[in-house]
Amino acid sequence: MSRSRINGNFIDKTFSIVANILLRIIPTTSGEKEAFAYYRDGMSAQSEGNYAEALQNYYEAMRLEIDPYDRSYILYNIGLIHTRNGEHTKALEYYFRALERNPFLPQAFNNMAVICHYRGEQAIRQGDSEIAEAWFDQAAEYWKQALALTPGNYIEAQNWLKITGRFE
């Protein structure tokens, strides 16, 4: 039984129902349908905190999915899991890969900025202000890209950019 069928979460059930209806009415190949089923099950596992299972489903979806746009969201979600697990280098890699396929993912730019900002704060705690500034500058660049895509979002980031003199 697929995860989406055993998940008790209302939103996940609603998503699964709508997704199943769309899969029936939109002309897609069996491979695309199978890829989406793995993606859907990965999202379900991820929402329950079952990250290892989510990753298995996402990797299988990546194996089957051919559309670059759809692949970008799979890669983005893999990045989210690595971020959650504190594997920031891996997370950045997956966000980059997602953006290569879909440069209009402001949430990926935002998450990359958050990681860079965090690393900047770590460098400050370690007494390395030069490295910290480099990380903060990189965070600023990513936040600017996120804001360029969605000007009304990421207010805290926008304020940080203004306060630190990095807003242009």
From Swiss-Prot:
GO cellular component entries: chloroplast thylakoid membrane
InterPro entries, per the entry: PSI_Ycf3_assembly, TPR-like_helical_dom_sf, TPR_rpt, Ycf3/AcsC/BcsC/TPR_MFPF
GO biological process: photosynthesis
Annotated localization: Plastid, Chloroplast thylakoid membrane
Mapped TPR repeat ranges: 35-68, 72-105, 120-153
Thylakoid recorded as keyword: yes
Topological category with respect to the lipid bilayer: Peripheral membrane protein
Keywords for the protein's UniProt record, in alphabetical order: Chloroplast, Membrane, Photosynthesis, Plastid, Repeat, Thylakoid, TPR repeat
Function: Essential for the assembly of the photosystem I (PSI) complex. May act as a chaperone-like factor to guide the assembly of the PSI subunits.
Family, per entry: Belongs to the Ycf3 family.
PANTHER family per the UniProt record, alphabetical: CELLULOSE SYNTHASE OPERON PROTEIN C (PTHR44943), TPR REPEAT-CONTAINING PROTEIN MJ0263 (PTHR44943:SF8)
Name of the featured protein: Photosystem I assembly protein Ycf3
Native source organism of the sequence: Morus indica
Lineage: Eukaryota, Viridiplantae, Streptophyta, Embryophyta, Tracheophyta
